Amino acid sequence: MNELIKAINELKKEKNAIILGHYYQKGEIQDIADYVGDSLALAQWAAKTEADIIVMCGVHFMGETAKVLCPDKKVLVSDMAAGCSLADSCPADQFAQFVKEHPGYTVISYVNTTAAVKAVTDVVVTSTNAKQIVESFPKDEKIIFGPDRNL
């Protein structure tokens, strides 16, 4: 295992890459990651990095978010089949159609959504700031909140 870790660290240096690992990853992945955190923290680290390559060890929407924030960088996702049930519960085409059918509404989406959902969103929130953001709008504001109403 030490040889593998050594090889990974050498490749990170050679390629000017960083590894971002989500809290849900196995300990072995977290051990080699340069940064470990939730989806928001990983996005923030991606946005700040000087690295040319970002290796995202998390679900696919996290890689999409990193690419949106860092369009000039190469973003690699360790497992494209790794999904998020919350993000998967909100198909972008259906969400976009729903938004289209409700003109004049402010669209707020949770950070755990795909880039395609975020593209039709006015405000992206986290679990930490969702209540504060929603309450900052006038009481009569028409709001669509996705992907679910339970947050």
Kindly give the residue locations of the regions a language model identified.
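Active-site loop-to-helix "anion-binding N-cap" substructures in soluble metabolic enzymes
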Residues: 1-151
